[in-house]
Amino acid sequence: MDYKKEGKEILEGIVIAIVLYLVISLTLSYALKVDNPVAVVISGSMEPVYYRGDIIVIKGTDPASIQVGDIVVYKRPYQDIPIVHRAINIIEEDGALYFVTKGDNNPFEDSYFENGKKFPGVPDYAIMGKSVMKIPKLGYVTIFFKRLIGVRI
């Protein structure tokens, strides 16, 4: 058994996987008009629509086109993890749009705070886009690596 050759083949496989991931991610990012076109579901808040470990594909969306019932993806200013919840109400206040969101499996609506101020919902500028597709359970790979090396992939 040639360990040097096997090690080289494993390294080549890892490099190819990383390059493929980057090419696919950049292509999706451009095509879907969003910086981060994929997210991993890490909680059960959207069951039975999405389960922990599902990967969702995000499409950048003009917030004005979002309707009640759409599943939106947003980020809070103090968290790097995208939140995937359903828009259950839309509030227009002083010319700004706010989306009241809630996980299908959660008992309460989401709260949104920024700089100590509570907003009536998720502000339009925090919306990344809408969920347009899911890949069941594939996200467990990234959850595993995150736990293994302590880094978000």
Regions found by a protein language model. Give the residues of each.
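Glycine-centered tight beta-turn/hairpin loop motif at sheet-sheet or coil-to-beta transitions
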Residues: 78-80
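Short coil-to-beta transition motif at edge beta-strands of beta-rich domains
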Residues: 64-76
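Protein maturation boundaries and topogenic segments
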Residues: 1-65, 136, 140-153
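Acidic/glycine-rich C-terminal interaction modules and beta/coil loop segments
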Residues: 31, 35-42, 64, 82-153
